[in-house]
Amino acid sequence: MARYRGAVERLERRFGVSLALKGERRLSGKSALDKRAYGPGQHGQRRAKTSDYGLQLKEKQKAKMMYGISEKQFRSIFVEANRLDGNTGENLIRLIERRLDNVVYRMGFATTRSSARQLVTHGHVLVDGKRLDIPSYFVRSGQKIEIKEKTKSNSQVVRAMELTAQTGIVPWIDVEKDKKYGIFTRYPEREEVVVPIEERLIVELYSK
């Protein structure tokens, strides 16, 4: 499945939660979901009964859309999560949070994960001082993530950092805002990752 490129706010209304796909509008309270907290379309306010499979599939689609991950990549991450010790669902979320594009977003260098992915793919991000343009790269504990010198004054990066001041930085990351770099200090615990995803349903789906 290719990445979704349609009306993202309509998508958020379908899932009934914010997927952090629209940066400034989400923070301003002016998103379509804030105004109409029900599904899109003529019958959007009706609550249709959904099967167990439908709920599981919807949860997987929600996670993929939120993080901007293709089906192939998502399944690959699940396989790795299942291989690791511990709870597969928690491993899944923790692995996804380690993706470079997501870490750039979490550090506040971009207002959305999509924008963070563009920064990475266009070569604007350094990992331990070396350019890395692979969004799916798993960041390791202790690694330094930095915006390239020429990009530090970019208006979108500066604006993103200003908006991040409203929401704060997650506890497993330290950021030097003035110098536009951050340290991925440790792997997050599941309870620290605030995302509207029931990973248990995704595990059930892939375990069939």
UniProtKB/Swiss-Prot annotation:
Pfam hit, one: Ribosomal_S4
InterPro entries reported in the protein's UniProt record: Ribosomal_uS4, Ribosomal_uS4_bac-type, Ribosomal_uS4_CS, Ribosomal_uS4_N, S4_RNA-bd, S4_RNA-bd_sf
Keywords in alphabetical order: Ribonucleoprotein, Ribosomal protein, RNA-binding, rRNA-binding
Entries under CDD domains matching the protein: S4 (cd00165)
Entry GO CC: small ribosomal subunit
PROSITE patterns assigned to the protein according to its UniProt record, in alphabetical order: RIBOSOMAL_S4 (PS00632), S4 (PS50889)
Residues covered by the S4 RNA-binding domain: 98-160
GO terms of biological process kind: ribosomal small subunit biogenesis; translation
SUPFAM superfamilies, alphabetized: Alpha-L RNA-binding motif
One example GO MF annotation: rRNA binding
Domain of life: Bacteria
Region annotation Disordered: where it falls in the sequence: 31-51
HAMAP family from the UniProt entry: Ribosomal_uS4_B
Family: Belongs to the universal ribosomal protein uS4 family.
Subunit relationships: Part of the 30S ribosomal subunit. Contacts protein S5. The interaction surface between S4 and S5 is involved in control of translational fidelity.
Described function: One of the primary rRNA binding proteins, it binds directly to 16S rRNA where it nucleates assembly of the body of the 30S subunit.
UniProt-recorded name of the protein: Small ribosomal subunit protein uS4
